[in-house]
Amino acid sequence: MKLFSCLMALLLFLLQAVPGLGLPRDTSRCVGYHGYCIRSKVCPKPFAAFGTCSWRQKTCCVDTTSDFHTCQDKGGHCVSPKIRCLEEQLGLCPLKRWTCCKEI
């Protein structure tokens, strides 16, 4: 699994180095969260759906057995940047710049 992550990071770096060959933004975000883009609308276990990839044509699936957890898995709530958290919490939110809050 570590080798695959390293290879994906290298591929992402090379794609960004060549003008015009960058990944779509949603795909880059998925890979940044150690996710995988699949064609199915449902992720296989132990993966959880976490947004989209390839211009919303594929589903981003994040491994739930890793250290990366969605905000709701940890009992938090994703809030927009306009809302201040009383207590922030670690966790991934599907929308860019949103924050995972334990208490709002």
UniProtKB/Swiss-Prot annotation:
Recorded GO CC terms: extracellular space
Disulfide bond residue pairs: C30-C60, C37-C53, C43-C61
UniProt GO MF annotations: CCR6 chemokine receptor binding
Predominant place of localization: secreted
Keywords associated with the record: Antibiotic, Antimicrobial, Defensin, Disulfide bond, Secreted, Signal
Leader sequence segment: 1-22
Tissues in which the UniProt entry reports expression: Detected in outer membrane of the vitelline layer of the egg (at protein level). Expressed in the liver, gall bladder, kidney, testis, ovary and male and female reproductive tracts. Expressed in the ovarian stroma, but not in the ovarian follicles. No expression is detected in bone marrow.
Gene Ontology biological-process entries: defense response to Gram-negative bacterium; defense response to Gram-positive bacterium; innate immune response in mucosa
Residues that span the membrane, as ranges: none
Similarity comment: Belongs to the beta-defensin family.
Protein name: Gallinacin-11
Species of provenance: Gallus gallus (Chicken)
Gene assigned in the entry: GAL11
